[in-house]
Amino acid sequence: MPYQFGINIERELSRLLGVCRIIVPTAVVEEVEKLAQQDGEVGRAATLGLSIIKKRGFRLMECAHKGDDGVIEAALKVDGAIVTNDKELKQKAKELELSVIYLRGGNRLEMEEELL
């Protein structure tokens, strides 16, 4: 998301939440590593994403599940929000009463529901 739209995800999350900790589920890292093997825009964006995760020292969280289920698992473990634009993941998160942060207008993040 940051690469395609030129936003600073850390700054945007701080604007929305104040002081926060970014946790990246291993399910996400595995998915992004696969995407990084592709040629073109997708591969470059994924490679940059992996670089950001490493350089910023974001905390990684081991997940028993893969894909969307791993993201939900991590959010439930820490009572956190999910950052995504994926419609199916947003719907699953809403059903579980998890807060969802998404890209709005191509230049800012917005929260669908307040964290409880």
Identify the role of each PLM range.
Residues 65-81, 87-96:
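Acidic, metal-associated active-site segment
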Residues 51-70:
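Acidic catalytic patch
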Residues 25, 82-83:
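Active-site-adjacent beta-strand anchor residues
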Residues 1-56:
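Domain-level signal for Mg2+-assisted phosphodiester chemistry and nucleotide/NA-binding surfaces
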Residues 37-38, 74-75, 113-116:
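Short, surface-exposed amphipathic charged segments that create phosphate/polyanion-binding patches used
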